[in-house]
Amino acid sequence: MNIFYLSPDPRHAAQYHCDQHCSKMMIEYAQLMSAAHRMTESSHADSCYKLAHKNHPSTIWTRSSADHYSWLFELWRELSNEFYARRGKHHGSWTKLKDVLCYNPHLPLEGFTEPPQCMPDEYKVNGDAVTAYRNYYMGDKASFASWNW
């Protein structure tokens, strides 16, 4: 589980996702938002993915603030647009859950903080998750990352 916070702007962050993450992270982001619904007993919970990784830092971050959830939903929406632009079809998680996950599951209004840096320490940058995730992409993910679709 992770949230690739490659830009504070969800549209730009989605565009920066490599091809492999353009598909894989559609599922992970839907899982994170589904967990928020399930853990808050949202009326939409039964339509979501099953609860997974409830104590992962990214899951905790997603459900800790309505602003976090909203930002992640916008990233997921933009990543769906990016997936469609690259592949010419909609991702299955978008088709299945877009009408459910668009509802914020009554989370606290705690404001916005950057997502946790879930990566090896060598890439972390205190107080700057964007730079940390870009470092992580250029370092740890460079061996498979491509933008060919």
What are these regions (language model features)?
Residues T95-C102:
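A glycine-rich phosphate-binding loop feature that marks nucleotide/adenosyl-phosphate handling sites
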Residues Y103-W149:
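Aromatic-residue-lined binding/catalytic grooves and analogous aromatic/hydrophobic interfacial grooves
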Residues I60, S93, S146-N148:
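Residues in intrinsically disordered, low-complexity segments of regulatory proteins
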Residues M1-H91:
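An N-terminal structural lobe/cap that precedes and organizes the functional/catalytic core
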